[in-house]
């Protein structure tokens, strides 16, 4: 990936609230299935905004920090997804999204970010990201002291 897109906590919350507003009325949803790990924080934000208490996970591994690798389902939520929102942080090449669609064909699949290759596989998203851009999520970064340029 040649470019990086850094997401702050504030940006993430703003984007999640925008997505939540599109998912109203909240009474239409039985619950949320968050794709672990990228969808965990966005899933918590959606659950808060929509007042949803039923939150489950589907645990899929497809990345090793910044390298995509073979897809592995570690745990899945039961059912076909009817009445559920499935949330992930982003859709990239579409590998995870295809697996989600197969597991939960009746779910409403949403992400915060979408890259061109995976965009057709989600029902809704908030931000377009170029395909060759790596997204640095706030939960993957730490806040550190940066000394002044002058050194004083």
Swiss-Prot record:
UniProt membrane topology term: Peripheral membrane protein
Top-level EC class as recorded in UniProt: transferase
Binding annotation for guanine: 92, 135
Cofactor(s), names only, from the UniProt record: Mg(2+)
Residues reported in the UniProt entry to bind 5-phospho-alpha-D-ribose 1-diphosphate: 37-38, 69, 88-96
Keywords: Cell inner membrane, Cell membrane, Glycosyltransferase, Magnesium, Membrane, Metal-binding, Purine salvage, Transferase
Residues the entry annotates as binding GMP: 69, 92-96, 134-135
UniProt pathway: Purine metabolism; GMP biosynthesis via salvage pathway; GMP from guanine: step 1/1; Purine metabolism; XMP biosynthesis via salvage pathway; XMP from xanthine: step 1/1
Listed Pfam families: Pribosyltran
Catalysis performed (reactions): GMP + diphosphate = guanine + 5-phospho-alpha-D-ribose 1-diphosphate; XMP + diphosphate = xanthine + 5-phospho-alpha-D-ribose 1-diphosphate; IMP + diphosphate = hypoxanthine + 5-phospho-alpha-D-ribose 1-diphosphate
Source organism of the structure: Citrobacter koseri (strain ATCC BAA-895 / CDC 4225-83 / SGSC4696)
Annotated function: Purine salvage pathway enzyme that catalyzes the transfer of the ribosyl-5-phosphate group from 5-phospho-alpha-D-ribose 1-diphosphate (PRPP) to the N9 position of the 6-oxopurines guanine and xanthine to form the corresponding ribonucleotides GMP (guanosine 5'-monophosphate) and XMP (xanthosine 5'-monophosphate), with the release of PPi. To a lesser extent, also acts on hypoxanthine.
GO term, biological process aspect, one: GMP salvage
SUPFAM superfamilies for the chain: PRTase-like
GO function terms (MF aspect): guanine phosphoribosyltransferase activity; hypoxanthine phosphoribosyltransferase activity; magnesium ion binding; xanthine phosphoribosyltransferase activity
Protein name as it appears in the record: Xanthine-guanine phosphoribosyltransferase
Localization terms from the record: Cell inner membrane
Source organism phylogeny: Bacteria, Pseudomonadati, Pseudomonadota, Gammaproteobacteria, Enterobacterales
PROSITE patterns registered for this protein in UniProt: PUR_PYR_PR_TRANSFER
Annotated residues for binding of Mg(2+): 89
Binding site for xanthine: 92, 135
Cellular component, GO annotation: cytosol; plasma membrane
């Amino acid at each position: 990936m040649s470019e990086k897109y850094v997401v702050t906590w504030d940006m993430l919350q703003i984007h999640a609230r925008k997505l939540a507003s599109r998912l109203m009325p909240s009474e239409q949803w039985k619950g949320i299935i968050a794709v672990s790990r990228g969808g965990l924080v966005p899933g918590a934000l959606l659950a808060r905004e929509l007042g949803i208490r039923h939150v489950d996970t589907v645990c899929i591994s497809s990345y090793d920090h910044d390298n995509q690798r073979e897809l592995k389902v570690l745990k899945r939520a039961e059912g076909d997804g009817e009445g559920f929102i499935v949330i992930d942080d982003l859709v990239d090449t579409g590998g995870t999204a295809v697996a989600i669609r197969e597991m939960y064909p009746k779910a409403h699949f949403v992400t915060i970010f979408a890259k061109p290759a995976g965009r057709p596989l989600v029902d809704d998203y908030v931000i377009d990201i170029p395909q060759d851009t790596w997204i640095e999520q706030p939960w993957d970064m730490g806040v550190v002291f940066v000394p002044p340029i002058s050194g004083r």
